[in-house]
Amino acid sequence: MVVTKAAISENLFEKLKLTKRDSKEFVEFFFEEVRKSLEKGEDVKLSGFGNFQLKNKKERPGRNPRTGENILITQRRVVIFKAGQKLKNRVEHYLMKVKY
């Protein structure tokens, strides 16, 4: 199963009794605020969930997987997510109950 923005919006509609339009706008607003903060170079800390941070990656040698040719991967800035301890604990607890 994959969680989508539409599914989150539908959940808000059902559980919080928001209108469908309001729940969709709420979800869009939330993700837009996360995007704006990251674009400004700010970390996004969601208590009990985790942190989105920007990380600078240095230039490094690499290999083109299609041709095998050695290439130089340029330095860049990437978004990383670090799960918070509460999220890690809940997922671990759930996984211990579920047998694969």
From Swiss-Prot:
One GO cellular component term noted in the UniProt record for this chain: cytosol
SUPFAM superfamilies found in the cross-reference section: IHF-like DNA-binding proteins
SMART domains with a match to the protein in the record: BHL
Coiled coil: none
UniProt cross-references to CDD domains, sorted A to Z: IHF_A
Domain of life: Bacteria
Single GO MF descriptor: DNA binding
Keywords from the named record: DNA recombination, DNA-binding, Transcription, Transcription regulation, Translation regulation
InterPro entries for this protein: Hist_DNA-bd (IPR000119), Histone-like_DNA-bd_CS (IPR020816), IHF-like_DNA-bd_dom_sf (IPR010992), IHF_alpha (IPR005684)
One Pfam family cited in the UniProt record for this chain: Bac_DNA_binding
GO terms for biological process, alphabetical: DNA recombination; positive regulation of metabolic process; regulation of DNA-templated transcription; regulation of translation
Protein role: This protein is one of the two subunits of integration host factor, a specific DNA-binding protein that functions in genetic recombination as well as in transcriptional and translational control.
HAMAP family per UniProt: IHF_alpha
Family label: Belongs to the bacterial histone-like protein family.
Subunit structure: Heterodimer of an alpha and a beta chain.
Name this polypeptide is given: Integration host factor subunit alpha
